[in-house]
Design a protein with these regions (language model features):
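Short, Lys/Arg-enriched N-terminal segments with co-localized hydrophobic residues
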Residues: 1-11
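Walker A (P-loop) phosphate-binding motif
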Residues: 11-45
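Residue-level signal for inorganic ion chemistry
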Residues: 25, 44, 94, 122, ...
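Well-ordered beta-strand positions
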Residues: 39, 45, 139, 183-184
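ATP-dependent small-molecule kinase phosphotransfer cores
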Residues: 45-119
Length: 210
C-alpha cells in the first residue's frame, strides 16, 4: 500500500499516470497491468462513453455541430470528423466539449477505485502531459522506444507511408521530452516478453505484487 505524505502518512492508493507516444506500446503495458488485477482508467474508453446515445456529451455535440452529426440517435463519427478536421476552430470546439467530459469521467472512475481501496490505480492517458494530467497523478510512467523504432512500428501498424507517419509523430510532444519528465520509463524497444518482465519487476519493487 502506498503511504502518502499528503494525508498524514496514511495508507492510500497510488495514482500512476501511464502514457507514451503514438505506437510506442502503451496499450501493451496497460494490458499487463489489467492482467495482474490492477484497475486501469482508460481515457480512450472514456472518450467513447461520454458520447454514447442519450449522454450529455452527445447532446452538447448536437447543439454545437447540428443534426448532421447524429445518425439514428448515435454519433456519426465520419460526419463529425469531416467537419472538425477541415477546420481547426471546429476541432478546438470539439476538444473543449470532450475535454471537460472526459476529465469528469476519469475523475469519477479514479475515485471509485480509490473508494474500493485498490493500492494502485493506473490512469491510461495518451496525451497526459499535453492535457496537464501530470498534476492529478502521484507518479508518471512513460512507455518509450527510440524514434526509429516508433516510426517503423507506426508505419507497419497503420499501413501508412513514412511521410504520413512522421506527421502523426510530429503532432505529439517528442517521446524523449516525455521520458525526461517521467518517474519511471518502460523500454519497449525489444520483445513483448522483455516489456512484461520490466512491468512485473516494477510491480514487485513497488510492493504491488509479492
Amino acid at each position: 500500500m502506498y503511504v502518502s505524505s499528503r494525508d498524514g502518512g496514511a495508507a492510500m492508493s497510488l495514482i500512476l499516470g501511464l502514457t507514451g507516444g503514438i505506437a510506442t506500446g502503451k496499450s501493451t503495458v496497460s494490458n499487463l497491468f489489467k492482467e495482474n488485477g490492477i484497475p486501469v482508467v482508460d481515457a480512450d474508453v472514456g472518450a467513447r462513453e461520454v458520447v454514447k446515445a442519450g449522454t450529455e456529451g452527445l447532446k452538447r455535440i448536437e447543439v454545437v455541430f447540428g443534426h448532421q452529426v447524429i445518425s439514428s440517435g448515435q454519433l456519426d463519427r465520419k460526419a463529425l470528423g469531416k467537419i472538425v478536421f477541415e477546420n481547426p476552430k471546429e476541432l478546438e470546439k470539439l476538444n473543449r466539449i470532450l475535454g471537460d467530459l472526459i476529465a469528469e469521467w476519469i475523475h469519477d472512475e479514479k475515485e471509485r477505485y480509490i473508494e474500493e481501496k485498490h493500492p494502485l490505480v493506473v490512469l491510461d492517458i495518451p496525451l497526459l502531459f499535453e492535457s496537464g494530467y501530470q498534476e492529478v497523478v502521484d507518479r508518471v510512467m512513460v512507455v518509450a522506444t527510440t524514434p526509429d523504432v516508433q516510426l517503423h512500428r507506426l508505419m507497419e501498424r497503420d499501413q501508412i507511408d513514412e511521410q504520413t507517419a512522421r506527421q502523426k509523430i510530429a503532432a505529439q510532444e517528442p517521446i524523449m521530452d516525455k521520458m525526461l519528465k517521467a518517474d519511471f520509463v518502460i523500454d519497449n524497444n525489444g520483445t513483448k516478453e522483455n516489456t512484461r518482465i520490466q512491468v512485473m519487476n516494477w510491480l514487485k519493487k513497488q510492493q504491488f505484487l509479492h
